């Protein structure tokens, strides 16, 4: 006698079938993404085949790389990446994505990569104007409240977002189609990010009056005036914030204090001056605001692990690549 399936059995069977189909889609998407990135970038390094879309290949582990984040959506096709922002630690892989919403000093490291299985990743830069436009067209509300949001976080990469990014990568091989379709696919990606778990964070970069936007303006000012004395009272007043409120909101967004932020920007610029413009340590230190050469050397060693000129010699010997999210 044939046993009739109950409603519960049918529902479970349907759920199992849907999960299986989703798993197949995810696997196919990851495999195609790896194939296309490997085809698009043959040697180690970073390339920008389409405006705002960066592809990166790394065939050996890297040491800690210091650099600056920018507002961007970042995914990994193969491998994983570790990232430090102040006291915060992040790790992401093919099942997760990283969303950054401000320009901040970061440290990035790739621990596993080989010629047989290189690290493959991509980054899509995000324009606040496009985020704002998509919010308006889709009727999405402004960020909830006026509190600040962390400038960086990692979330699970869902299949719809992954497939949208894959469609963008496909356009690399079709320049004629890219001219017409890239703006549309980019807006789809922005929309999917806006309605994701990180959507509220992303909305902050388009909200002029929000606390996160005000901190972003402070970050921009500190980066531009890194060699000048830090005047917190004046900056907070300019942003319409109390000094204590500014400190609290700044650390909530950047994971560091304004003074720590300025120090990292100064030291990274000094490193660039010594490595790129062949300045000596004393001159580079003075250029970025350090009048005391000994103090500059101590601060530099504290951040980069070695004294200034020894660090630059190591960089030149290793021909270190620029940091990428």
What are these regions (language model features)?
Residues 222-225, 274:
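Short helix-to-turn junction characteristic of helix-turn-helix DNA-binding domains
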Residues 213-216, 255-288, 310, 315-325:
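Hydrophobic, well-ordered secondary-structure segments
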Residues 24-60:
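N-terminal, Lys/Arg-enriched amphipathic/low-complexity engagement segments
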Residues 45-142:
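N-terminal regulatory/effector-sensing and dimerization cores
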Residues 82, 229, 278-279:
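Residue at a beta-strand N-cap/secondary-structure junction
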Residues 7, 12-32, 131-188, 192-193, ...:
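Amphipathic alpha-helical segments enriched in hydrophobic/aromatic residues interleaved with Lys/Arg
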Residues 1-14, 321-325:
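Intrinsically disordered, low-complexity and often Lys/Arg-enriched segments
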Residues 188, 192-198, 205-208, 223, ...:
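Basic/polar phosphate-binding segments, predominantly the helix-turn-helix DNA-binding elements
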């Amino acid at each position: 006698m044939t046993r009739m399936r109950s409603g519960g059995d049918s529902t479970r069977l349907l759920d199992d079938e849907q999960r299986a189909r989703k798993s197949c889609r995810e696997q196919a998407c990851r495999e195609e993404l790896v194939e296309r990135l490997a085809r698009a970038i043959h040697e180690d390094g970073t390339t920008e085949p389409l405006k705002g879309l960066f592809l990166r290949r790394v065939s050996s582990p890297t040491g800690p790389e210091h650099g600056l984040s920018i507002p961007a959506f970042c995914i990994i096709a193969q491998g994983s990446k570790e990232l430090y922002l102040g006291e915060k630690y992040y790790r992401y892989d093919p099942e997760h994505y990283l969303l950054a919403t401000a320009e901040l000093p970061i440290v990035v490291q790739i621990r596993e990569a080989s010629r047989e299985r290189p690290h493959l990743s991509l980054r899509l830069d995000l324009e606040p104007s496009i985020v704002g436009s998509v919010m308006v067209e889709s009727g999405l509300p402004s960020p909830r409240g006026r509190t600040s949001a962390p400038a960086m976080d990692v979330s699970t990469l869902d299949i719809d977002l992954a497939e949208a990014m894959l469609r963008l990568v496909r356009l690399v091989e079709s320049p004629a189609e890219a001219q017409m379709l890239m703006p549309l696919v980019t807006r789809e990606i922005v929309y999917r990010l806006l309605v994701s778990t990180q959507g509220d964070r992303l909305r902050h970069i388009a909200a002029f009056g929000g606390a996160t936007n005000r901190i972003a303006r402070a970050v921009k000012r500190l980066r531009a005036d890194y060699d000048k004395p830090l005047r917190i009272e004046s900056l907070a007043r300019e942003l319409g914030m109390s000094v204590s409120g500014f400190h609290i909101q700044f650390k909530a967004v950047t994971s560091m204090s304004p003074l720590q932020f300025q120090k990292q920007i100064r030291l990274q610029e000094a490193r660039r001056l010594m490595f790129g413009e062949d300045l000596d340590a004393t001159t580079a230190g003075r250029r970025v605001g350090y009048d005391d050469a000994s103090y500059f050397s101590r601060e530099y060693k504290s951040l980069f692990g070695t004294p200034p000129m020894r660090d630059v010699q190591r960089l030149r010997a290793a021909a270190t690549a620029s940091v990428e999210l």
